[in-house]
UniProtKB/Swiss-Prot annotation:
Its main location: cytoplasm. It is found in: Cytoplasm. Cell wall formation. Catalyzes the addition of glutamate to the nucleotide precursor UDP-N-acetylmuramoyl-L-alanine (UMA). This is UDP-N-acetylmuramoylalanine--D-glutamate ligase. Pathway: Cell wall biogenesis; peptidoglycan biosynthesis. Keywords: ATP-binding, Cell cycle, Cell division, Cell shape, Cell wall biogenesis/degradation, Cytoplasm, Ligase, Nucleotide-binding, Peptidoglycan synthesis. It is an enzyme of class 6 (ligase). It comes from Methylobacillus flagellatus (strain ATCC 51484 / DSM 6875 / VKM B-1610 / KT).
């Protein structure tokens, strides 16, 4: 357990996580300083107001900022590989994140369910939270979704449901979740990790001292994380592997969520579209087994869940063409899941900041499902190179608004237009939510134009 009173703590990175950590550390009696590589980081005014006199180091990290630190608390956006961080580690200075501080401070009676993965983690985290709330548990959903973890520590909480990114897990050592999952691994953040193995290793840290591992039977990376001597359950889109595992069973042409050979509910009863969401529902059920929740209550919570914004979310129908917003699809794996999940002919809008990904995995699903692809953003050309042999028409849009009009004109009646960029948004937009807002407005404007035509 870290002793924080009177300890000199350097917080790296402002923004929501950094500000949350500063406030929490101040309450523990730590002596504080902060460093951020940006000249004007978000939260700077609030920090200056709340912590007058505290040393604030802005711009490229220097040895002087790190010199007196006895503990470093790194925000997720700061890589552990940063040279000054590495130099501090070599001097024996511990480097942790806010999730590690949470792990050491949380009440022992509260359960922790932890979720990570390249795709689906926000949906599964929210589903688990909804199931726990429906079962009457005082539940907090936090981490990479919602509030920072240090803002929600409360002795009255029964269950913490945490969405955790690979960045957060890099500096987490003792979470000891009651149940944890790595939903899947696909190329993402390759601008931060040396290779897929390094990315997977960061994700696998979620299983450190976990009570139950929930593994994706359909994902070789997740499956390969099974640890000896730890309880495991699997989920997947094939029949369950054992009487305790989760999967799909088929009866008279209808797919059912199942545990072992027991049919639980028809997939068609879910309000969230696509087989990837059936997998998400199965993962949520598997994670909740550590809480001994009444199955009827859990299944009703699944039925009631309407989905999250910007995850293959229906926007409008215009002249027989359905528009879907999957702006949260910021990597190749998410877009592949969306294409298979909608499982209909469509025009795909993709592109943005590719984060060093290999887009080759898009080729086969695009060839199967797409009538055309309209590419936008900085890495449009990189994606075009990867899709050249798909046999699908490739077009370009200088703006997202232009791409929406082009996609509509390329679509046939009965098709969909899917915004699923497979890329980050910051080359053209403030964030993925802003990208979604621009898309929805472009669709709405198109709808008005078609109605008045």
């Amino acid at each position: 357990m870290l002793q924080l009173k009177d300890k000199q703590v350097l917080v790296l990175g402002l923004g929501d996580t950094g500000l949350s950590a500063l406030r929490w550390l101040a309450r523990q009696g730590a002596r504080l300083s902060v460093a951020d590589s940006r000249a004007l980081p978000p939260g700077l005014d609030a920090v200056r107001q709340e912590f007058p006199g505290m040393a604030i180091h802005l711009g490229p990290f220097t040895a002087a900022a790190f010199k007196e630190a006895e503990l470093i608390v790194a925000s997720p956006g700061v890589p552990v590989a940063e040279p000054q961080v590495q130099a501090a580690i070599e001097r024996g200075v511990p480097v942790v994140g806010d999730v590690e501080l949470f792990a050491q401070a949380r009440s022992a009676h509260a359960k922790v369910i932890a979720i990570t993965g390249a795709n689906g983690k926000s949906t599964v985290t929210t589903l688990v939270g909804e199931i726990c709330k429906a079962a009457g548990f005082k539940t907090v959903v936090a981490g990479n979704i919602g509030l920072p973890v240090l803002d929600v520590i409360n002795d009255a909480v029964d269950v913490y449901v945490l969405e955790l990114s690979s960045f957060q897990l890099e500096t987490t050592y003792s979470l000891a979740a009651d149940a944890a999952t790595v939903l899947n691994i696909s190329a993402d953040h390759m601008d931060r990790y040396a290779d897929m193995q390094a990315y997977a290793n960061a994700k696998a840290r979620i299983f450190t001292r976990a009570g139950l591992q929930v593994l994706n039977a359909d994902d070789a990376w997740s499956r390969g994380m099974a640890a000896e001597g730890v309880a495991q359950l699997t989920f997947g889109l094939d029949a369950p592997r054992s009487a305790q595992d989760f999967g799909l069973l088929h009866d008279a042409g209808e797919a059912w969520l199942a545990r072992g050979q027991r049919k639980l509910m028809p997939v068609a009863d879910l309000n969230i579209t696509g087989l990837h969401n059936a997998a998400n529902a199965l993962a949520a059920l598997a994670l909740c087994t550590v809480l001994d929740i009444d199955e009827v209550v859990a299944l009703q919570a699944l039925r009631d869940f309407k989905g999250l914004p910007h995850r293959v979310q229906w926007v409008a129908d215009i002249d027989g063409v359905s528009f879907y917003d999957d702006s949260k699809g910021t990597n190749v794996g998410a877009t592949v899941a969306a294409l298979h999940g909608l499982n209909r002919k469509l025009v795909l809008i993709a592109g943005g900041d590719g984060k060093g990904q290999d887009f080759a995995a898009l080729r086969a699903p695009v060839a199967k499902h797409a009538r055309a692809v309209v590419l936008i953003g900085r890495d449009a050309g990189v994606i075009a190179d990867a899709l050249q042999e798909s046999g699908v028409l490739l077009e370009y849009g200088d703006t997202l608004e232009e791409a929406v009009v082009k996609a509509f004109n390329l679509a046939d009646r009965g098709d969909a237009v899917l915004l699923s960029p497979a890329c980050a948004s910051l080359d053209m937009f403030r964030n993925y939510v802003h990208r979604a807002e621009v898309f929805v407005k472009a669709v709405t404007d198109l709808q008005k134009k078609e109605v008045s035509a």
